[in-house]
Amino acid sequence: LIIGVLALNINIKDVYGENIQSLRVDARNAIAIDRESKTILFEQNGYELVPMASTTKILTALITIERGNLDEKFVVSKNASSVRGSTVGYKENEEITVRELLYGLMYRSGNDAAITLAEGIGGSIEGFAEIMNNYKTSLGLLDSHFESPHGLDMTDHYSSAYDLALLTAKGMEYEEFREIVGTKEISQSKYNFTRDYSNINKILWKIPGANGVK
């Protein structure tokens, strides 16, 4: 199970020296790559196919940002408002901008935000999953398959640490993505949101130099 993706504004060799492969990582699956060159700096079961849980939302966010029109409003459906797991708490028939939904998605890991984006962009969860799989093919992600925008348990929904690292590196090319995943709090007034948001990603609060991601 992949549970986190970390981005750092540091040279990892400056911290651990040349003997980076001796680094101890408790996670079963881990990989470190250079964002620009994609050079693999450390790898531990990085190509194993495993469920990726809410790190799925990295791709949901990336597709949404590349689509553009972040000020468009989507209507929250009953399907979205009643989803299990982590949510923002959006109510059925609420109208939320795409930008705010992105913050709900990545700040709060909101499954309700994920479904609202998926339905607004793809027409349905199934339609959005098709977009996700077409997109991952265009990025050359060979070890991934997507069935949902949020990562709740599905039978054929998986990725690898390596694929998620490549996906994250792509996301970090976009200013909007970097802003969303790299900040701790945002007030309702900044973009005329419906509520304030605080980022639940503990990495941002506990690790100096961290700038995301999930």
Residue ranges and their predicted role:
Residues 84-116, 197-212:
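Conserved catalytic neighborhood of penicillin-recognizing serine enzymes
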Residues 42-63, 73-75, 96-104:
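Short active-site loop at a secondary-structure junction
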Residues 2-55, 70-72, 129:
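Beta-lactamase-like hydrolase cores
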Residues 75-86, 154, 187-188:
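Acidic helix-start/capping segments at beta-turn-to-alpha-helix junctions
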Residues 21-27, 98, 124-214:
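Penicillin-recognizing serine hydrolase domain
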Residues 62-69, 119-122, 166-173:
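Short glycine/serine- and small hydrophobic-enriched flexible loop segments
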Residues 66-79, 175-183:
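Short, well-structured active-site flanking segments
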Residues 39-47, 95, 145-146, 207-208:
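Glycine/charged-rich beta-loop-alpha catalytic/anionic-binding loops adjacent to active sites
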